[in-house]
Amino acid sequence: MIVAVLVVLVTLGSVAFHMWSPWWWSEIASNWVGMDDTIILTFWITGAVFVAIGLFMAYCIWQYKYNKDKRADYEPENSKLEWALTIITTIGVIALLAPGLIVWNNFVTVPKGAYEIEVVGQQWYWMYRLPGKDGVLGTTDIKNINDDNPFGLNTDDPHSLDDVLIDADDLHILKDQPLKLNLRALDVLHDFYVPQFRAKMD
C-alpha cells in the first residue's frame, strides 16, 4: 500500500513540478512559435502517457498485492490486447512525429537570400566566419588548420582572403535577416544551441 501511494505521489508530483517549475524557456523568436507549440503538444501526449502508466502501476501494486489465497493466471498471448496496444502506440507515434517533421522541415529549409555563416566548435569555445565583401565564404581544408590558421582557410582561394573571422563566443546578428549556419568542429562533437530559436544541433 505504501509503495502504491509513493508511486502516485511521484507521478503527480512530477507533473506538478513541471507545470509550476521556476525554470522555463527563454523568450522565443516570433517566427518560431510553431516550435514551442510542437514541444508543448509533445509534453501533453507524453505527459498523459506518463500519468496513465504511473497510476496503472500504482493500481496494480495495490490490487494485486500478495495474497496467499490468490494465484496468478498464465496467459502467454492476448491478441486483442496486442492489437489495441499496437494501434494506440501507432496513433501516438504519428501524433508526435507529424508536427515535429513539419517544424523540422521549416527549420532546415534555407530561405532565399539567407546570410551564410560558418560556426566552428572547439573545446570549450566557438568561432565564426562570415563572408567578406564578395559575399562568398572561401573554401577550407582540415589539413590547413594550425595556430596561425585556426579555420583551415585555403589561402589559394581568393574568396577566403576577405572572409571575416570572429574569434569569440558571442555573435550578434541583424534583425529579420534569414541565416544559414554551417556547423563544423576542430576536435570533438559539440552541441550548438540558440535558446531563442530552439535551435540545437550536435
Model-derived features: positions:
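Alpha-helical transmembrane segments of integral membrane proteins, especially early/N-terminal helices
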Residues: 1-19, 48-55
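Alpha-helical transmembrane segments and their helix-start/interface "positive-inside/aromatic belt" motifs
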Residues: 1-8, 39-43, 82-86
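Non-transmembrane, membrane-proximal soluble domains of secreted or membrane proteins
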Residues: 16-39, 61-202
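Alpha-helical transmembrane segments
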Residues: 36-52
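Transmembrane alpha-helical segments in integral membrane proteins
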Residues: 50-66
